[in-house]
């Protein structure tokens, strides 16, 4: 996984990548002669959401913080369930229909702990990790950005209108990077009164 950012610590592996996810690679990261069970969860982009056709999902993240959050979740779950190992990788960028956006693998001496830990890792990741997704709908629907958690309320994105009207701050328009991942450190405010 060439363009991955990863953290590895005490039987925990976490990563963010723009590449395709490989389930076998992730299973091998937790494989051990001490483990009697390996559980794999693969979150896959489906073709609909709320009765609307989905074209693709796009994910963005505050990567340094997201990696730390993922590692913290993995370490907590590793100890809580007495796991052998745990690994979690989240894909960023465009994830087409039928492709995985997240893989979580856990290994344990016994299957019950592995099942419980895998589900808990997923729920914690969706609740706490700094990853956001844009659901791109087919037809005239456009897209909606939302937190990467079940039931999160999204904000409709109209690409044409978004480009036409800048957000207004107290000192004038706020200029933002034009696409996720573009360089920039938050909104830039141009003060028209100061001529900057």
Swiss-Prot record:
The keyword Transferase applies. Disulfide bonds: none annotated. Its EC number is 2.8.1.12. It catalyses: 2 [molybdopterin-synthase sulfur-carrier protein]-C-terminal-Gly-aminoethanethioate + cyclic pyranopterin phosphate + H2O = molybdopterin + 2 [molybdopterin-synthase sulfur-carrier protein]-C-terminal Gly-Gly + 2 H(+). CDD domains: MoaE. GO terms for molecular function: molybdopterin synthase activity. One of its GO terms (cellular component) is cytosol. Substrate binds at residues 110-111, 126, 133-135. One of its GO terms (biological process) is Mo-molybdopterin cofactor biosynthetic process. Coiled coil: none annotated. Residues 147-168 have a biased composition (Basic and acidic residues). Catalytic subunit of the molybdopterin synthase complex, a complex that catalyzes the conversion of precursor Z into molybdopterin. Acts by mediating the incorporation of 2 sulfur atoms from thiocarboxylated MOCS2A into precursor Z to generate a dithiolene group. Heterotetramer; composed of 2 small (MOCS2A) and 2 large (MOCS2B) subunits. Belongs to the MoaE family. MOCS2B subfamily. This is Molybdopterin synthase catalytic subunit. It comes from Sclerotinia sclerotiorum (strain ATCC 18683 / 1980 / Ss-1) (White mold).
